[in-house]
Amino acid sequence: MTAALHIGHLSKSFQNTPVLNDISLSLDPGEILFIIGASGCGKTTLLRCLAGFEQPDSGEISLSGKTIFSKNTNLPVRETTFGLPRTGRCSVPHLTVYRNIAYGLGNGKGRTAQERQRIEAMLELTGISELAGRYPHELSGGQQQRVALARALAPDPELILLDEPFSALDEQLRRQIREDMIAALRANGKSAVFVSHDREEALQYADRIAVMKQGRILQTASPHELYRQPADLDAVLFIGEGIVFPAALNADGTADCRLGRLPVQSGAPAGTRGTLLIRPEQFSLHPHSAPVVSIHAVVLKTTPKARYTEISLRAGQTVLTLNLPSAPTLSDGISAVLHLDGPALFFPGNTL
């Protein structure tokens, strides 16, 4: 199978400051990839290099087997087949929604029957058929997002590129537009690259996630693999919350840390020192011990919240704050037992 997108050893600097450092990844046909990372990690620059708005210093980019950038090739933007929705606004404010989508076909008119059929199909696909005669200033932010996607899909691009497409929308509208946009992409069989800083969004909608830090890709994997079998401590901390401790491995598949001796998931040899990570959802709190891994603790404070209870407690010399969706009614100062569900993750050589 020919990759929808292939990036090989791509690098880019601005004024001798590296922004992209040896980036390599690929995207299968119909696959949705989310690139996530903190602000300034290089994810938007990577997207701009893919779109042809920035020229990389080295490396190569190919689209469905066709090289669009390499040492000897640099196709102009007009000769590539990317779709890049200008999210949040229509590109031609004096044209109707229908004409804006026709603009994506190159002439802004929809002259032929085939073009008109394509425009109608994109209006229906993105749920805006009833808006065809309106102008951009008559649309809400969410409606403009749909127009932008319909216009980008109209010329049937091989790949859609989206840079923080939902950031300007309120939470409720963002959720609806996001689900509709993902559904439209999948219904149209399009590969897509999303740039986002929203880890929950990526975990829910991506086929694969690439985590970036300081111009490098730390790991590219499915959401499940990235969350459950992370290859890098920085990646796992960005993709989800975690409680970390310095630790040392034992020969029996456990590690010693400030919470005591805990089971771990690691293939490193005994004596290896590193960092132990426990996901918050692995903890549950009970008044009594049980035949599982138990950590004795003292409840310092409980604070009921809307969807969970915030509990501060002391285990030995360590103070933990946990947000538990369901927790027994416990008075401050009472002794309780933390249960650990499953092994902790261990990262050799990562010391705090």
Swiss-Prot record:
Keyword Membrane: yes
The enzyme's E.C. designation: 7.2.2.7
Compartment(s) where it occurs, according to its Swiss-Prot or TrEMBL record: Cell inner membrane
Cystine bridges: none
Residue span(s) of domain ABC transporter: 5-239
Gene Ontology cellular component terms for the protein in this record: plasma membrane
Keywords: ATP-binding, Cell inner membrane, Cell membrane, Ion transport, Iron, Iron transport, Membrane, Nucleotide-binding, Translocase, Transport
Transmembrane regions: none
Membrane topology: Peripheral membrane protein
Reaction(s) catalysed (UniProt annotation): Fe(3+)(out) + ATP + H2O = Fe(3+)(in) + ADP + phosphate + H(+)
UniProt GO molecular function: ABC-type ferric iron transporter activity; ATP binding; ATP hydrolysis activity
Residue sites binding ATP per the record: 37-44
Stored InterPro entries: AAA+_ATPase, ABC_SmlMolc_Importer, ABC_transporter-like_ATP-bd, ABC_transporter-like_CS, ABC_transpr_FbpC, FbpC_C, FbpC_RD, P-loop_NTPase
Quaternary structure (record): The complex is composed of two ATP-binding proteins (FbpC), two transmembrane proteins (FbpB) and a solute-binding protein (FbpA).
Function, in words: Part of the ABC transporter complex FbpABC involved in Fe(3+) ions import. Responsible for energy coupling to the transport system.
PANTHER family: PUTRESCINE TRANSPORT ATP-BINDING PROTEIN POTG, SPERMIDINE/PUTRESCINE IMPORT ATP-BINDING PROTEIN POTA
Family that this chain belongs to: Belongs to the ABC transporter superfamily. Fe(3+) ion importer (TC 3.A.1.10) family.
Protein name in UniProt: Fe(3+) ions import ATP-binding protein FbpC
